[in-house]
């Protein structure tokens, strides 16, 4: 596992990953953890070419780019700079804003820092990650907007966010929160909420929700549904579904504290992905664990560009 035996402090990190060559060697092992394997013929030997960023199969001659198909594809910046940025992002307990990354990395523009951060956030979601299981609390909340929204499920100007968090079973129920999932949803209809659950919660998990009609079909969908009859007040919901409402509060404070609330609907999903990544690794024994995990994910993520990131938009 690459996440082991990695440096926790900045001086040690720079000694380990201070050169492009050191970073290339580590990235090679992340991309081919069991050793090089040609995608064309399956041969296990290759020759390094072009400063070791391209590897040519010794059998069939097919060339494999170390960076192609990763978040680093087509970068004009050395890998040591990328590794440093990832370390700064993952080693900061509360995260780091684009403006702060610009300052620490000495970038010439805010756009560069913003783009790098969004590329890094894309690597915070592992492709094919496992869905939540056992007992899960599920609810929705609203994020953003210039003014406090109206009570209930109709809040103009705010993004709708669905959340699910594992709470355990039996004696451990509610004592220690497990994994978390958050996502921006188009609305709180049954179709939207069941779609969120289908992507994030395994069947036949036990799903605790309030009595909203959007959850009425969960039993038929294959879940063990625990509908709770709650009043319309926030206090009742927070009392009966404490885990997910605790997480909602933490996420909103994180958005306000690290990013000063300056997160629009268009890119909110990416920021939620970062919060989930951090929350799910909150018990890591050292700071290097999130860094190692993110590098492993980075070689599995399809590349993107600033233009694509700007054009992307989530549900209203």
Predicted feature residues:
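Residue-level recognition of single "structural anchor" positions
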Residues: 1-316
């Amino acid at each position: 596992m690459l996440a082991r035996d990695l440096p926790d402090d900045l001086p040690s990190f720079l000694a380990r990953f201070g050169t492009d060559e050191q970073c290339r060697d580590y990235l090679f092992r992340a991309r081919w953890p069991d050793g090089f394997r040609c995608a064309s013929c399956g041969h296990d030997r290759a020759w390094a070419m072009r400063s070791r960023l391209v590897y040519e199969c010794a059998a069939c001659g097919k060339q494999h780019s170390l960076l192609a198909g990763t978040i680093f594809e087509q970068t004009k910046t050395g890998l040591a700079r990328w590794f440093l940025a990832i370390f700064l992002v993952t080693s900061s307990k509360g995260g780091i804003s684009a403006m702060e990354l610009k300052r620490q990395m000495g970038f010439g523009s805010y756009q560069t820092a913003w783009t790098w951060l969004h590329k890094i956030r894309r690597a915070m979601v592992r492709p094919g990650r496992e869905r939540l299981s056992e007992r899960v609390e599920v609810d929705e909340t609203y994020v953003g907007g210039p003014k406090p929204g109206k009570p209930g499920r109709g809040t103009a100007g705010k993004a709708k966010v669905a959340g699910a968090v594992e709470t355990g079973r039996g004696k451990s129920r509610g004592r220690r929160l497990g994994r978390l999932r958050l996502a921006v949803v188009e609305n709180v209809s049954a179709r939207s909420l069941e779609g969120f659950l289908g992507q994030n919660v395994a069947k036949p998990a036990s799903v605790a929700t309030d009595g909203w009609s959007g959850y009425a079909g969960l039993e038929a969908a294959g879940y063990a549904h625990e509908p709770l009859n709650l009043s319309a007040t926030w206090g009742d919901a927070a009392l009966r579904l404490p885990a997910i409402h605790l997480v909602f509060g933490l996420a909103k404070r994180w958005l306000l504290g690290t990013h000063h609330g300056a997160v629009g609907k268009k890119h909110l999903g990416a920021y939620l992905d970062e919060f989930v990544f951090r929350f799910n690794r909150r018990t890591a024994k050292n700071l290097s664990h999130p860094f190692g995990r993110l590098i492993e994910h980075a070689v599995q993520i399809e590349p993107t560009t600033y233009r694509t990131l700007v054009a992307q938009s989530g549900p209203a």
